[in-house]
UniProtKB/Swiss-Prot annotation:
<keyword id="KW-1003">Cell membrane</keyword>
<feature type="transmembrane region" description="Helical">
    <location>
        <begin position="252"/>
        <end position="272"/>
    </location>
</feature>
<feature type="transmembrane region" description="Helical">
    <location>
        <begin position="217"/>
        <end position="237"/>
    </location>
</feature>
<keyword id="KW-0472">Membrane</keyword>
<comment type="pathway">
    <text>Protein modification; lipoprotein biosynthesis (diacylglyceryl transfer).</text>
</comment>
<keyword id="KW-0997">Cell inner membrane</keyword>
<comment type="function">
    <text>Catalyzes the transfer of the diacylglyceryl group from phosphatidylglycerol to the sulfhydryl group of the N-terminal cysteine of a prolipoprotein, the first step in the formation of mature lipoproteins.</text>
</comment>
<keyword id="KW-0808">Transferase</keyword>
<dbReference type="GO" id="GO:0005886">
    <property type="term" value="C:plasma membrane"/>
</dbReference>
<feature type="binding site">
    <location>
        <position position="154"/>
    </location>
    <ligand>
        <name>a 1,2-diacyl-sn-glycero-3-phospho-(1'-sn-glycerol)</name>
    </ligand>
</feature>
<dbReference type="Pfam" id="PF01790">
    <property type="entry name" value="LGT"/>
</dbReference>
<keyword id="KW-1133">Transmembrane helix</keyword>
<dbReference type="GO" id="GO:0042158">
    <property type="term" value="P:lipoprotein biosynthetic process"/>
</dbReference>
<feature type="transmembrane region" description="Helical">
    <location>
        <begin position="189"/>
        <end position="209"/>
    </location>
</feature>
<feature type="transmembrane region" description="Helical">
    <location>
        <begin position="71"/>
        <end position="91"/>
    </location>
</feature>
<dbReference type="GO" id="GO:0008961">
    <property type="term" value="F:phosphatidylglycerol-prolipoprotein diacylglyceryl transferase activity"/>
</dbReference>
<dbReference type="InterPro" id="IPR001640">
    <property type="entry name" value="Lgt"/>
</dbReference>
Length: 282
C-alpha cells in the first residue's frame, strides 16, 4: 500500500496547455487535433489497404477509394454522435435528465468509446447496404485503422489531465492538476500503448503476415477482443468516473469493465465465424 509520503514524492504533471494554439478568437484544443490526426491517418492507411487487392478475397478490393473517401464523413459522424450519446447514456444520464442542456456541452468533455463504436457500426451498416459493399470487409478496414484514433485520443486525455488512474507510488506516477495532491497511474498512457500501438501492430501483422483480410470478419474479431482485454486490464489502474464510482458494492468493478466484457464474446464469435466461412470455401 503506497504511503502518503511516497505519493507526494512522485513527479508532477507536465503542465501542458490543453489549447494547442489559437487563431484569433478561435482556440484549437489538443483533443480536437487528436480526432483530426486519428481520422486522417486512419483514412490514409485505409486507402492503402483498399488499394492493395492482393490482401482481399479473390484478389479484389471490396470498395473503391472514392467510396472510402465518402465513408469518412459517415465515420466521423458516427464517432462524434455515438460517442457523445454513449457517454450521456452510460455515464451521465441522471445529470442530463436534470439539465438537458448539459448534453450539448461537449466542451466540458464526455465521449464514450463504446458509444462511438456503436455509432460507427450503424454508419457502416447503412453505408455498406447503400453502396453494395461487403459489410464484414468494411468492418475489417475500419477495425484495422481505429487504433490510430485510440492512440491520439488517449494522449489528448493525458494532456488534458483527465481520466487519470488510481493512487500509486510507481516511479512513473504523475500528480494531475485535478486529481488531488497524490500521485496516480498515468492510465491514459497505458491505454494509448495497448489500445493504440500494440493493437495496431498486432492487426498489421495479421493483415500483411497472415493475409487475415481474406477471411472477412477475422480482423474485426481480433480488434474487438483486443480492445476489450486491453480496456479491462487498464481499468484496474484507472480511477472510475466520479459520478458512478465502483459498481455493485465492489472496490474494483467499473462501467468500462461491464461494457467491455461482452465484447470478448462478440470478438470470439466474429473470429470463429470468419474461420468457418473460410473453411466452407475451400
Amino acid at each position: 500500500m503506497p504511503t502518503a509520503a511516497n505519493l507526494l514524492a512522485i513527479m508532477p504533471f507536465p503542465d501542458i496547455d490543453p489549447i494547442a494554439f489559437s487563431i484569433g478568437p478561435l482556440a484549437i484544443h489538443w483533443y480536437g487535433l487528436a480526432y483530426v490526426a486519428g481520422i486522417l491517418l486512419g483514412w490514409a492507411y485505409a486507402r492503402r489497404l483498399a488499394a492493395n487487392e492482393s490482401l482481399w478475397p479473390g484478389n479484389a478490393s471490396p470498395m473503391t477509394r472514392t467510396q472510402l473517401d465518402d465513408f469518412i464523413v459517415w465515420a466521423a459522424l458516427g464517432v462524434v454522435l455515438g460517442g457523445r450519446l454513449g457517454y450521456i447514456f452510460f455515464y451521465d444520464l441522471p445529470a442530463v435528465l436534470r439539465s438537458p442542456v448539459r448534453a450539448l456541452e461537449i466542451w466540458n468533455g464526455g465521449m464514450s468509446f463504446h458509444g462511438g463504436l456503436t455509432g460507427t457500426t450503424i454508419a457502416m451498416i447503412i453505408f455498406a447496404r447503400r453502396n453494395g459493399i461487403p459489410i464484414w470487409s468494411l468492418f475489417d478496414i475500419v477495425a484495422t485503422v481505429v487504433p490510430f484514433g485510440l492512440f491520439f485520443g488517449r494522449i489528448a486525455n493525458f494532456i488534458n489531465g483527465e481520466l487519470w488512474g488510481r493512487l500509486t507510488d510507481v516511479p512513473w506516477a504523475v500528480v494531475f492538476p485535478t486529481g488531488g495532491p497524490f500521485a496516480r497511474h498515468p492510465s491514459q498512457l497505458y491505454e494509448a500503448g495497448l489500445e493504440g500501438i500494440v493493437l495496431l501492430l498486432v492487426l498489421a501483422a495479421l493483415v500483411y503476415g497472415m493475409r487475415a483480410l481474406k477471411s472477412p470478419g477475422f480482423i474485426t474479431g481480433v480488434f474487438v477482443c483486443g480492445y476489450a482485454l486491453s480496456r479491462i486490464f487498464v481499468e484496474f489502474f484507472r480511477e472510475p468516473d466520479a459520478q458512478l464510482g465502483y459498481l455493485l458494492g465492489t472496490n474494483w468493478l467499473t462501467m468500462g469493465m461491464v461494457l467491455s466484457s461482452p465484447m470478448i464474446l462478440l470478438g470470439l464469435w466474429a473470429m470463429l465465424r470468419a474461420r468457418r466461412q473460410a473453411a466452407l470455401q475451400l
